[in-house]
C-alpha cells in the first residue's frame, strides 16, 4: 500500500537499496553480510528479519501469549495455521512446542510458491530459482528458498550438524534433496507439522467467505492460513484447542 511504502521510504534514517530480483536474492545478500563476522563488527551491521535469532525469540513469546488467551487448562492444546514462505514465524512455533508449549498442530500455509508444502507432503525439498518464483497476491510469501527451514531440518535429522550441512550446502546447490518416509512421518507425528497451499482464486473465495460469515476482512496472507486449515481437514475444535 502507499502507506506501507511511505513507512519504508520517508524516514531520514532509512536508506533503501533496490535489487533486480526477488526476496530470495535480497536474502542472499543479507546472508553473505551476516556470514562475515569481521565486516559486520566493523560496520555495526545487523539483520532484523528471521535470520536473526533474536527475532525468533520474540516470535516465540506471542505463541505463548496467544495460547494463554485461548486456553482454560494447563494441558489444553492449540493448533496454529501460519502463512509462511521463509519458515520464520512457524519456526518460532516449532521452538515454542519444543519448549513445552501444548501445541497440537503447526500448519504450514503457502501460496503458489509451494516449496514447503511439497516437502511436508512428499519429502522432496526443491528450492526454485528466482525466475521460477511467482509474483502472487500474498507477496510476503513469494519465497522459494526458506532460510529458517534448515533450523527445523536440524531437529528432524536428529540434530546431526554434518548431515544438515551436507543437505543444505551441496545438495541444495545441486537442486534439492529427498528425505525418506520415516522422516516425513516424524515431521507430522513427532513435531506436529501439516501443510497446505492455496491459489489466488482460493484467497479471494476465502476472504469473501470470512467477510460474509464473520464481518471480518482478512488480508490475503491470513486467507492462505485459513485455506490451509480447510485443506488439511483439521477439525474446528482443534483450532480452538478444545
List the predicted regions and their residue ranges.
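Generic helix-packing signal
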Residues: 30, 34, 97-100, 229, ...
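Active-site-adjacent helical/loop segments in soluble small-molecule enzymes
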Residues: 31, 35-77, 155-230
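Alpha-helix C-terminal capping segments
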Residues: 68-70, 92-102, 227-231
Amino acid at each position: 500500500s502507499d502507506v506501507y511504502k511511505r513507512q519504508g521510504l520517508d524516514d531520514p534514517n532509512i536508506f533503501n537499496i533496490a535489487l533486480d530480483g526477488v526476496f530470495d536474492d535480497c536474502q542472499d545478500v543479507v546472508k553473505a553480510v551476516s556470514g562475515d563476522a569481521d565486516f559486520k563488527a566493523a560496520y555495526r551491521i545487523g539483520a532484523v528479519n528471521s535470520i536473526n535469532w533474536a527475532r525468533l525469540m520474540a516470535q516465540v513469546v506471542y505463541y505463548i501469549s496467544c495460547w494463554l488467551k485461548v486456553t482454560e487448562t494447563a494441558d489444553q492444546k492449540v493448533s496454529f495455521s501460519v502463512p509462511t514462505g521463509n519458515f520464520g514465524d512457524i519456526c518460532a512455533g516449532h521452538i515454542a512446542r519444543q519448549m513445552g508449549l501444548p501445541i497440537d498442530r503447526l500448519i504450514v500455509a503457502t501460496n503458489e510458491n509451494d516449496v514447503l508444502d511439497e516437502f511436508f507432503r512428499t519429502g522432496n525439498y526443491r528450492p526454485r530459482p528466482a525466475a521460477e518464483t511467482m509474483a502472487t497476491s500474498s507477496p510476503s510469501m513469494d519465497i522459494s528458498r526458506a532460510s529458517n527451514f534448515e533450523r527445523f531440518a536440524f531437529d528432524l535429522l536428529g540434530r546431526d550438524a554434518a548431515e544438515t550441512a551436507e543437505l543444505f550446502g551441496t545438495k541444495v546447490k545441486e537442486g534439492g534433496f529427498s528425505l525418506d518416509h520415516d522422516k516425513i512421518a516424524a515431521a507430522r507425528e513427532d513435531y506436529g507439522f501439516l501443510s497446505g497451499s492455496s491459489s489466488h482464486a482460493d484467497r479471494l473465495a476465502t476472504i469473501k467467505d470470512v467477510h460474509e460469515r464473520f464481518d471480518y476482512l482478512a488480508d490475503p496472507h491470513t486467507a492462505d492460513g485459513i485455506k490451509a486449515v480447510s485443506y488439511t481437514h483439521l477439525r474446528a475444535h482443534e483450532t480452538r484447542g478444545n
